[in-house]
């Protein structure tokens, strides 16, 4: 085992790379944190205590994991790269509250793993430097499963983070904003420079905090259908919702008048663009659509 100096330093990271002859895989989005201050900011934002269970995705060499282990009751980490398992066994050997599962997070039975490893934790947080190429699928997969997650403090590509946290009417606001804000209250923690990673990524990064709502922001009877309807309004951002929905519905061009009636009954001006509609507006559209069986997709 190497000395137990913090992993998140350039010298310790290079020593680990040399010891294990490790080469970064670009296809896995491997950019490891080498700045303890950034990690401390993430830990602080996570409100982790001795009763918290943490899910981490992509622990890498354990930079963030070791700090999580020092603060949380238990850490459950999913690492897809088999080559990193012996490294993590080494770097995390001082901690008996960490479980590393060598699986793809998108294929793993997360609910079962949580029940097996975090069952005695009072709170569960997802805290991770997410692989940038699959950030959105990971978050949606976690949010849409029946897993008792209280919140997320996650690093991601700045552009994606801004979309999650976007306000109605902004350029970043879109269907992803709606899905994430339906489930969670979102806020920005900090912007992160490229220099705190090894190797530096090609994009800027951001840490966002997403706290699970006790109830979704609006009430709908079919979340999947609701999200599809909202997404259709952004199909071509420069077009009006009237145009986008004409293209979205089966025989929409033949039902122009019906679409206008539907929008009018929902109190939505057909000349508006999708980015100007709030989640509550989309919920009205979704409910009113039930009165118009001609509008199929």
Swiss-Prot record:
It catalyses: adenosine(1518)/adenosine(1519) in 16S rRNA + 4 S-adenosyl-L-methionine = N(6)-dimethyladenosine(1518)/N(6)-dimethyladenosine(1519) in 16S rRNA + 4 S-adenosyl-L-homocysteine + 4 H(+). It comes from the Bacteria. Its main location: cytoplasm. Disulfide bonds: none annotated. It holds the Pfam family RrnaAD. GO terms for cellular component: cytosol. Its EC number is 2.1.1.182. S-adenosyl-L-methionine binds at residues 31, 33, 58, 79, 104, 129. One of its GO terms (molecular function) is 16S rRNA (adenine(1518)-N(6)/adenine(1519)-N(6))-dimethyltransferase activity. InterPro entries: KsgA/Erm (IPR001737), rRNA_Ade_diMease-like_C (IPR023165), rRNA_Ade_Mease_Trfase_CS (IPR020596), rRNA_Ade_methylase_Trfase_N (IPR020598), rRNA_adenine_dimethylase (IPR011530), SAM-dependent_MTases_sf (IPR029063). SMART domains: rADc. It is found in: Cytoplasm. Keywords: Cytoplasm, Methyltransferase, RNA-binding, rRNA processing, S-adenosyl-L-methionine, Transferase. Specifically dimethylates two adjacent adenosines (A1518 and A1519) in the loop of a conserved hairpin near the 3'-end of 16S rRNA in the 30S particle. May play a critical role in biogenesis of 30S subunits. Belongs to the class I-like SAM-binding methyltransferase superfamily. rRNA adenine N(6)-methyltransferase family. RsmA subfamily. This is Ribosomal RNA small subunit methyltransferase A. It comes from Staphylococcus aureus (strain bovine RF122 / ET3-1).
């Amino acid at each position: 085992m190497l000395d137990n100096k913090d992993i998140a330093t350039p010298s310790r990271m290079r020593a680990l790379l040399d010891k294990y002859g490790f080469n970064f895989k670009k296809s896995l989005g491997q950019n490891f944190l080498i700045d303890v201050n950034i990690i401390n900011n993430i830990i602080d934002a996570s409100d982790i205590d001795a009763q918290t269970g943490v899910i981490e995705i992509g622990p890498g060499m354990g930079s963030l994991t070791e700090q999580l282990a020092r603060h949380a009751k238990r850490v459950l980490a999913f690492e897809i790269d088999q080559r990193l398992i012996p490294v993590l066994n080494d770097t995390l050997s001082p901690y008996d509250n960490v479980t590393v599962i060598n699986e793809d997070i998108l294929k793993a039975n997360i609910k079962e793993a949580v029940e097996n490893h975090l069952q005695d934790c009072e709170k569960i947080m997802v805290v991770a430097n997410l692989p940038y190429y699959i950030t959105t699928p990971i978050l949606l997969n976690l949010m849409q499963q029946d897993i008792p997650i209280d919140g997320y403090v996650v690093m991601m590509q700045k552009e994606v983070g801004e979309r999650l946290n976007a306000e109605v009417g902004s350029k970043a606001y879109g269907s992803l904003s709606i899905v994430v804000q339906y489930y969670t209250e979102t806020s920005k923690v900090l912007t992160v420079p490229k220099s705190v990673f090894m190797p530096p990524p090609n994009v800027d990064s951001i840490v966002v905090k997403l706290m699970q709502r006790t109830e979704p922001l609006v009430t709908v009877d079919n979340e999947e259908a609701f999200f599809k309807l909202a997404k259709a309004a952004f199909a071509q951002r420069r077009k009006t919702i009237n145009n986008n929905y004409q293209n979205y519905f089966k025989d929409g061009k033949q039902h122009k008048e019906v679409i206008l009636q539907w929008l009018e009954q929902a109190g939505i001006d057909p000349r508006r663009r999708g980015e100007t509609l709030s989640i509550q507006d989309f919920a009205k559209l979704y409910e009113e659509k039930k009165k118009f069986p001609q509008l199929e997709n």
